[in-house]
Design a protein with these regions (language model features):
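Positively charged, small/polar-rich N-terminal and surface patches that mediate targeting and assembly
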Residues: 1-113
């Protein structure tokens, strides 16, 4: 099993969610996060004063999938989240040793569905 973590632009969340649904992903975790990379920050005006906003709002999606579905999920996220501009985000893939469905006690890949 693999955990896929994707950091994407907030306005792309719905597109990514629909793309994942189209490849059979039934659930995911979404967290509002802030960060910076090559995109750096930007300046904003507030009450006549200029402020540097260094951390930009992003959305972090997390989903655990069977190994054989990994490529399909990564491709779906990549297609849906891409704008072609700096700041589109990143995808990280991590190994998952175990999954447990708390309600039933089911473990392994059975607990994912």
């Amino acid at each position: 099993m693999k955990k896929v973590e994707a950091i994407v632009k907030p306005f792309k969340l719905e597109e990514v969610k629909e793309a994942l649904s189209a490849v059979g992903i039934q659930g995911l975790t979404v967290t509002e996060v802030k960060g910076f990379g090559r995109q750096k920050g930007h300046k904003e005006l507030y009450r006549g004063a200029e402020y540097m906003v260094e951390f930009l709002p992003k959305v972090k999606l997390e989903v655990v999938v069977q190994d054989e579905r990994l490529e399909q999920v990564v491709e779906a996220i990549t297609r849906a989240a891409a704008t072609g501009r700096i700041g589109d985000g990143k995808i990280f893939v991590l190994p998952v040793d175990e999954a447990v469905r708390i309600r039933t006690g089911e473990t392994g890949e059975i607990a994912l569905g």
